[in-house]
Each structure stands twice: as C-alpha cells, then as structure tokens.
Amino acid sequence: GNTKYTAGAMRFAYENGDQLMSLLDKPNDKRIKDTDFGSYTQEKFETDLLNFNDGRPLSHEQKILVSKSLETIQWLSSHNVKFEPIYSRQSFLKDGKHIFWGGLTLASENEGVGLFDQELDAFLSLGGKIFYDSPVTNLIYEVGKVKGVYVNEEKVNADSVICASGGFEANDGLRKSYIGDNWINAKVRGTPHNTGDGLKMALEIGAVKHGLYNGCHATPMDLHMKNYGGLDLEPSERKNYRKICY
C-alpha cells in the first residue's frame, strides 16, 4: 500500500499534551518538558476537514474519523505502535519552548516506512498471517453474501472479506474515467499496485459506489519525475515521492 510512501504523521484530536505521553516512543526525551503541544480539538479537526469539502457538510465517515481518532491512536499505541513529536517541521522555538502548531503533532520514527514496520510487527504478534504471491482474482459471492475469495483459481472461504486494496491512482484508465482526461498523465508518487482491482471486484457483484470518486489529493510535481519509487531515499528527501491518493 501507500503507507511506506507517506510521512507517517498522524492527525487526531486531543485536548492537551498529557494525552500524548502514552503514545510516545521516547517519553523521557529532554525536550518534552520544554514543549507546548497545545490542543487539537474535535471541533478544530472538523473545521479543517470542512475546508476541503468544497461546500459539502461532513460525511458520516468524516464524523467517525474525528470522534474516534484519539481512541484509534491509543489502540495502536496499546499494540506497541509508538510515535515521536514532529519537532522538525511542526514546531517552532519561542522563549525557550517548542510550540506546536497545525494539529499534526506526532509521526512514526522513519516516517511511513517506520509506521509500516511497527504495524506489521503488531499484526504478526496478534497471530496474523501473510500470504505472499497470492493475488485475489475474484470474490466468492453466493446467495447475496460474500463468502471468501479466489486466489488465482483456488477457493478460500472466509466469514468476512475486507477489500483493503487501496484506490485506483496507479490505473491510468480509471483516473481518466473518474477524474478527467488530463489525469491520465498524472505522476503517481505512491505504490504501483493500487490499480482499483478490489473496487472493481466489489462493483461487479453489485456493491454501491460510495465516496468522492472525482476528487483526490494531489500536489504539483516535476514534469520529468519518474512514476513511483522514492523508498530508496532518506526520509528527509522522500517528500517528492509522498503519495498521491484517490
């Protein structure tokens, strides 16, 4: 997925710095005592989201994102997924104190790669299993219910299936279809594997489209920048390849 291509920063609502202490990988960092983390309330989080909604009210999913954000980050922390304050780009020094701004306070060490590694360790420690070279080619759909997946031609039954297969940013045709003709030329800064396969499989059995298919997060890029890549760069140099998502 795109996790490795991100900055590993986590946006979540919190009332004060005390709520952050249990989330930190290094709570004894000497800078902590001279740090003002401020607050990032649910109301502020909602306001920031509305600024990206182009006049639309908050969706049900956005409201859940806000209301469950602290609870979710605490759950990750309970499974040893830890974070560090983003001193380098989300704080400034004033009168001897590190003052945080913008609501983006914590990130994983080593950015998205570090976040991926921590989450993978947590998944495996909970008994999760990963099957490599096992592409899902179709959903098993019987009597109005998804009952598993086909891995190549092999049938794998399951009580439930989560299509955590990303969006369609790496699919030129779907970008053109949903976002516009010019988007066929867009540079893809994230993974080459998010080609919309999971979405297509779900739609083929009658799933209802949900969300803003004609919107995306994008940023100006060099015309000659290569598609994908960037994981071989140091985190501080990787910003040019942080993900573009749909």
Where do the language-model regions lie?
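FAD cofactor-binding and catalytic pocket of flavoenzymes
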Residues: 34, 221-246
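Dinucleotide-binding Rossmann-like beta1-alpha1 core, especially the glycine-rich loop
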Residues: 15-79
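Fold-independent oxyanion-binding glycine-rich loops
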Residues: 7, 14, 133-135, 152-153, ...
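Conserved redox-cofactor binding core of oxidoreductases
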Residues: 58-154, 171-174, 222-224
